[in-house]
Amino acid sequence: MTARDRLIVGLDVPNLQEAEKVVSALGDDILYYKIGYQLAFAGGLEFARDLAKDGKKIFLDMKLLDIDNTVASGVENIVKMGMSMLTLHAYPKAMKAAVAAAKGSDLCLLGVTVLTSMDEEDLIAAGYEYDPHTLVLRRAEQALLAGMGGIVCSAEEASAVRKIIGPDMALVTPGIRPAGSDKGDQKRVMTPAEGIRAGSSHLVVARPIVKAADPREAARAILAEMDAAL
């Protein structure tokens, strides 16, 4: 895969007008886009369908978690939308239900391990007994056993996760920031080159591109850094 196949631009913008502006600015340079709650609930699901019809790949970041039947029903409908990736929290029963519902489709199911905005203090406050690294590895093992298509984790854990899941599963890393850029609300971050060298198959970059004065120039700089690390 080239850097263009690996870079996912997060459309973390408040409305369709902003999303359309970003996609237009990036043109053919970008293949993959991530759409999460913010845009999905502002007309973004139909926009996702349209982008997919235009040949773009869409990572639908819904982080599903519910009873088995509800998760399965949701996944069945998302398969019909033509999405390329879908996230759900890496809980064994939910993952197994999703895998069964997506069987035979091209949808890559991704297990979310620990949010990159969380550190050990946050996990303790939420009632977990594991530090982020340990919990990520445990959930990676569970995702592998469930038959998931990939894992979402920070670049800090990517190398260790890759050893668990092997070379074939997708390893998607958010919290990627070019050197010198603002971390924002992310706590466990790495540069694009570091993410690639750590074993990530795909990198998610949002603010450093969508908030840049020249999004295409920002994206091209990140693509060049990734290509150099491949």
Curated annotation (Swiss-Prot):
GO molecular function: orotidine-5'-phosphate decarboxylase activity
Pfam name, any one: OMPdecase
Binding site residues for substrate: 12, 34, 61-70, 116, 177, 186, 207
PROSITE patterns: OMPDECASE
Gene Ontology terms: cellular component: cytosol
Domain of life assignment: Bacteria
SUPFAM superfamilies reported for this sequence: Ribulose-phoshate binding barrel (SSF51366)
E.C. code: 4.1.1.23
Disulfide bonds: none
Protein task: Catalyzes the decarboxylation of orotidine 5'-monophosphate (OMP) to uridine 5'-monophosphate (UMP).
Keywords: Decarboxylase, Lyase, Pyrimidine biosynthesis
Protein name: Orotidine 5'-phosphate decarboxylase
Summary of subunit composition and partner proteins: Homodimer.
Similarity comment: Belongs to the OMP decarboxylase family. Type 1 subfamily.
Gene coding for it: pyrF
An individual GO BP term: 'de novo' pyrimidine nucleobase biosynthetic process
Active site: 63 (proton donor)
Reactions catalysed, as given in the entry: orotidine 5'-phosphate + H(+) = UMP + CO2
Source organism phylogeny: Bacteria, Pseudomonadati, Pseudomonadota, Alphaproteobacteria, Hyphomicrobiales
